[in-house]
Amino acid sequence: MYGIEYTTVLTFLISVILLNYILKSLTRIMDFIIYRFLFVIVILLPLLSAQNYGINLPITGSMDTPYINSTQGEVFLTSTLCLYYPTEAATEINDNSWKDTLSQLFLTKGWPTGSVYFKDYTDIASFSVDPQLYCDYNLVMMKYDATLQLDMSELADLILNEWLCNPMDITLYYYQQTDEANKWISMGSSCTIKVCPLNTQTLGIGCLTTDTNTFEEVATAEKLAITDVVDGVNHKLSVTTNTCTIRNCKKLGPRENVAVIQVGGSDILDITADPTTAPQTERMMRVNWKKWWQVFYTIVDYVNQIVQAMSKRSRSLNSAAFYYRV
């Protein structure tokens, strides 16, 4: 009986000793592997070069600041630049190779061939319906027209800011705007917008909810309409939905990879919605030349200074989805 107990104890002790030996052996092996691995890394580290990925901090500035006409050493090897211009520019220039000429001139400012894209649009109204800004930097040229001044302001407000939009079902619901950043944006071939403010009993204030003819008309046959009403008040809307789409939008902040270049006009467009604040002139500038060749030459000269007032963004603007922050 005692022999069996002694044997059991002895077996247990031997097992503990063997386990301890095995663990120590494994520890030595792991230490050897780890130290050898670290040694190899230390030896190879000076021979390796890794890509450093950093945060692209926004660069802001005012286009009213006087800029120096200069060629800078900074080369935008990984950036793309889009120039949006009215078709009348190409018609006036009347040169099949004018884009190649400008590409060579942009090369002297550090923009490689193939990094600058030229996109035309028919007029402000058609561009308003489907503005698609996909480049790292986007310069939109608008020729000033006194009869289209308000349309130009609305388009500038749309493309110079980021908007988060949601669908509106005006047949079922009343809507109200919560603050100054909340707007209703309508797009289409013809947008006529009428509103009827409601009191707490959902009765029309100065209008009849059952008669759209009594509604206040805030936009008539527009292709782009940004509607601003009294905040905190419910409204019933009437929209030409067969030719227009309306969305409830929130202005998130500036879209800093877009700049507007106004061609001609006595004053720079002011897109400030709140009349109590200073005019918003950032990323907006004016070029006063009669000929489009001179306009493009000026843009080439100052392109790097203009870009410095912008910030490269990965998000694009695609109005087809009507979701402006993509």
Curated annotation (Swiss-Prot):
Which Gene3D superfamilies does the entry link to? Glycoprotein VP7, domain 1, Rotavirus outer-layer protein VP7, domain 2
Binding residue positions for Ca(2+) 2: 177, 228-229, 231, 301
The superkingdom of the source organism is Viruses
Q: Which keywords annotate this record?
A: Calcium, Capsid protein, Disulfide bond, Glycoprotein, Host endoplasmic reticulum, Host-virus interaction, Metal-binding, Outer capsid protein, Signal, T=13 icosahedral capsid protein, Virion
Which compartments does it reside in?
Answer: Virion; Host endoplasmic reticulum lumen
Changes after translation: N-glycosylated.
**What is the protein's major site of localization?**
virion
Keyword Manganese appears in the UniProt entry: no
Where do the record's glycosylation annotations fall on this chain? 69
Q: Name one GO molecular function term.
A: metal ion binding
Region: CNP motif, residue numbers = 165-167
Q: Does the keyword Signal apply?
A: yes
Q: Which residues form the signal peptide?
A: 1-50
Its function, per the record, reads: Calcium-binding protein that interacts with rotavirus cell receptors once the initial attachment by VP4 has been achieved. Rotavirus attachment and entry into the host cell probably involves multiple sequential contacts between the outer capsid proteins VP4 and VP7, and the cell receptors. Following entry into the host cell, low intracellular or intravesicular Ca(2+) concentration probably causes the calcium-stabilized VP7 trimers to dissociate from the virion. This step is probably necessary for the membrane-disrupting entry step and the release of VP4, which is locked onto the virion by VP7.
Q: Which HAMAP family match?
A: Rota_VP7, Rota_VP7_A
Return the similarity comment. Belongs to the rotavirus VP7 family.
Could you give the subunit structure recorded for this chain?
Homotrimer; disulfide-linked. 2 Ca(2+) ions bound at each subunit interface in the trimer hold the trimer together. Interacts with the intermediate capsid protein VP6. Interacts with the outer capsid protein VP5*.
| The protein, known as | Outer capsid glycoprotein VP7
- Organism the protein comes from: Rotavirus A (isolate RVA/Pig/Australia/CRW-8/1987/G3P9[7]) (RV-A)
